[in-house]
Regions:
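N-terminal lobe/hinge region of extracytoplasmic solute-binding protein
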Residues: 53-103, 266
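Extracytoplasmic/peripheral linker and loop segments enriched in polar/acidic and small residues
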Residues: 10, 388-397, 401, 405, ...
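Gly/Pro-rich hinge or "lid" segments in bacterial periplasmic/extracellular proteins
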Residues: 180-183, 187-212, 220-221, 226-302, ...
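Local pocket/hinge segments that shape ligand/substrate recognition
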Residues: 30, 335-456, 580-584, 621-637
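Ligand-site clamp/hinge motif
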Residues: 253-255, 259, 289-338, 352
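Ligand/substrate-recognition segments at binding pockets and active sites
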Residues: 120, 278, 319, 450-455, ...
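Long beta-strand-rich cores associated with HINT superfamily self-processing modules
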Residues: 556, 635-677
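Append "and occasionally in soluble cytosolic enzymes with long acidic Gly/Pro-rich linkers
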Residues: 92, 285, 386-505, 612, ...
Length: 677
């Protein structure tokens, strides 16, 4: 008897399951009752190894400096944090067994448990102490190491911003840096740095020692952080990369070579990094020295490099050679119609802390930043023409109202795609104010509704055409839109996006020419987004902590800041790339964020202020919202519902608490596991 099911039947059930999971996960991420391990979890199968392919090479394994999805795997699994979350999103003890808050001194005190560092052989090196957190934070605040998440420290830890800026300016002085605008840096014999900007009085910066930074090892098992203000999201921030510990003597010995290999990485988490060979293999093993080793059920995690993982992975699943693979939309139908594979397909656990949006490149030319150079768009994509077009608000609004996100989301979620659609950057149920009002119902965000409107899009297009023509823009405007070939179905999303948006905006006039380009599979962010080699790009952002300020990180830049942000909006204004009413909109957003950050004693007012700023960012089409992360269709032997969960940070990447089963999970089992957690 043929018991195959149709794709529509499967997807309808799975989309409802995923949508329910999203809602449940988002809500529990903001509160809920504590729970032990998920009930109904199957026991381990014949082995406790977990093998998966990967096809995108991480640029680094240094968890103190990275911020990308793939590269934080080691930090998430091999290094424990002060606090962690259970599988329902409830915070619990981690390396700290207790903590206290002193509002008068703005100081958190953490009391640490006994724990050890182990090397790549699993041998004990030294105990974990409070000083390891201090040394790690000093490493993050060292400009030479260019930590991508340094802003998560300088914004909240007392003295950190002054320390970092002084040493950044000192480095500039010692290396003879001259900024694009002519700003110079000099240092005298006493270490005082003078910064001289054109048309400004020189500013002097006295030496700042690390002792001035608000992190202290009171003794081996007592750690304190002194904050710049009573920041409500600080505890949730601790379950993220820049607040992880690192063994101080190893940092001192290895410097910028820290965590570039298994030999230069020490672990104190559920697993230790046993082997790492670039473009070959990546092995983590269970750490028997970990305090919670009894709740680690996987002995060996092996990641094997395969450039064609999306093709070879499913075939290796059929042969039982690996434990997980993504089932792309191009083969999903055949898998669901085949009795031998239909019960091997389920879904990943929804990653509710990630949202997706489109960014415009406001700086399409080569540009020098404080710690790297941006090449900009290639000449064939006409960056000069794009630079003129992107400064036109009506042009950008034609995109905002012309994009039908349902079409693009349907590539990965053929049924239930509207469950993932967003008209904001922040997802629903991320946090609520003191009265329990969802953040998306606060301030001006409460007025944002569906943007897609073909008639409005054409109105904005028609208004833009004479303005752009007067500015010297030629049509059609080339829109370079890259994708990462290692990301399943991203290429297909780009194709339907091009067809849909061109169908709207090119109706009656040759307005735009969306040119889809394949970026490199390895180091895509460094090669494309951070290198300015795009005009319009799908980006994502994962919340780092439970406060709306985290959703500003891709967009906000402090005055004069030259650090890494997705769009370099303020830099674009300061350096003359962004002009006119677009520049006004950018600066109004920056000022609104600066005012919102100052509100620390009234949560309702704080959330309203951030909501107003986010609404202005969107309504001025400085960014175009897309949707929430859609869980992939996968074949897996892991019950991810047993694992840690949080709506912020990297908890969802941790494999502690998860069993390897003796079979691939079906969709019905996936739903049962979800309901039993």
């Amino acid at each position: 008897m043929n018991t195959s099911i149709s794709r529509r039947q499967f997807l309808k059930a799975s989309s409802l399951a995923a949508a329910g999971a999203c809602a449940a996960g988002l809500l529990t991420g903001c509160g809920g009752s504590s729970s032990g391990s998920a009930s109904g979890a199957a026991s381990s199968g014949s082995g406790s190894s977990y093998t998966i392919l990967y096809n995108s090479q991480p640029a680094t394994l240094n968890y103190l400096t990275t911020g990308t999805d793939l590269e934080m795997v080691v930090g998430a699994n091999c290094v424990d944090t002060l606090v962690e979350y259970d599988n329902k999103g409830v915070m619990r003890e981690g390396l700290a067994t207790s903590w206290d808050w002193d509002v008068d001194t703005l100081t958190w005190t953490f009391h640490l448990r006994e724990e050890n560092w182990v090397d790549c052989n699993g041998e004990v090196v030294a105990p974990v102490t409070a000083q390891d957190f201090v040394d790690a934070l000093k490493y993050v605040l060292t400009p030479d190491y260019a930590a991508s998440n340094v802003g998560l420290v300088t914004a909240y830890i007392a003295g950190a911003d002054d320390y970092y800026n002084y040493h950044l300016y000192l480095n500039n002085a010692n290396t003879g840096v001259v900024d694009d605008d002519g700003t110079t840096y000099t240092v005298d014999g006493s270490g005082v740095v003078t910064v001289t900007a054109p048309d400004s009085d020189p500013a002097t910066y006295a030496p700042v020692d690390f002792d001035a930074v608000g992190v202290t090892a009171v003794d081996d098992h007592t750690l304190t952080y002194t904050l710049t203000y009573d920041f409500p999201g600080f505890l949730s921030l601790l379950c993220y990369l820049p607040y992880e510990p690192a063994y101080g003597p190893l940092l001192e010995e290895t410097g910028d070579q820290f965590a570039t290999s298994a030999e230069t990485t020490y672990s104190c988490g559920a697993f230790y990094l046993a082997a790492y060979e670039s473009l070959e293999t990546w092995v983590m093993k269970k750490n028997p020295e970990n305090y919670d080793a009894d709740n680690v059920f996987i002995d060996t995690i092996s990641r094997i490099y395969n450039a064609e993982a999306s093709v070879n992975g499913p075939e290796m699943i059929k042969r039982g050679e690996i434990d997980e693979a993504t089932i792309g939309s191009d083969i999903l139908d055949s898998w669901l119609s085949d009795d031998t594979t239909k019960d091997m397909v389920s879904m990943d656990r929804p990653n509710t802390n990630y949202t997706y949006f489109y960014m415009f490149n406001f700086m399409p030319f080569s540009h020098e930043f404080s710690n790297w150079s941006v090449e900009g768009m290639d000449a064939e994509y006409e960056p000069e023409n794009w630079a003129k077009a992107i400064n036109n608000t009506n042009f950008r609004k034609s995109f905002l109202y012309g994009i039908n996100n349902s079409v693009t989301l349907a590539v990965k979620a053929p049924e239930g795609y509207d469950n993932y659609k967003l008209n904001t950057i922040t997802p629903p149920s991320f946090c609520a104010n003191a009265d329990g009002v969802d953040y998306l119902k606060c301030g001006d965000l409460a007025n944002i509704t569906e943007f897609f409107d073909e008639a409005k899009a054409k109105e904005y297009r028609d208004a833009a055409i004479p303005e752009l023509t007067a500015a010297g823009v030629t049509f059609p405007i080339k829109v370079q839109m890259p994708y990462n070939p290692s990301s399943t179905d991203w290429d297909k999303q780009c194709q339907v996006f091009k067809q849909q948006l061109e169908g709207v905006l090119n109706d009656g006039f040759d307005f735009i020419d969306i040119i889809i380009t394949a970026g490199p599979s390895d180091s895509f962010l460094s090669s494309v987004r951070r290198n300015g080699k795009f005009a319009f790009l799908q980006c994502n952002w994962g919340a780092d902590y439970s406060d709306p300020q985290t959703e500003t990180d891709p967009f906000y830049q402090a005055e004069g800041a030259r650090g890494s942000r997705y769009a370099f909006l303020r830099t674009g204004v300061e350096d003359g790339f962004i002009t006119g009413d677009t520049a006004d909109a950018v600066m109004n957003y920056m000022k609104a964020i600066e005012e919102a950050v100052k509100i620390t004693d009234d949560i309702n007012a704080r959330y309203d202020a951030f909501a107003n700023a986010e609404a202005s960012l969107i309504n001025n089409a400085l960014v175009v919202p897309m949707g929430m992360s859609i869980p992939a269709y996968i074949a897996t032997r892991l019950n991810y519902w047993e694992g840690q969960y949080a709506s912020t940070g990297f908890s969802n990447k941790r494999l502690k608490g998860i069993h390897v089963l003796d079979h691939y999970i079906s969709m019905s089992e996936y739903e049962a596991n979800r309901d039993a957690r």
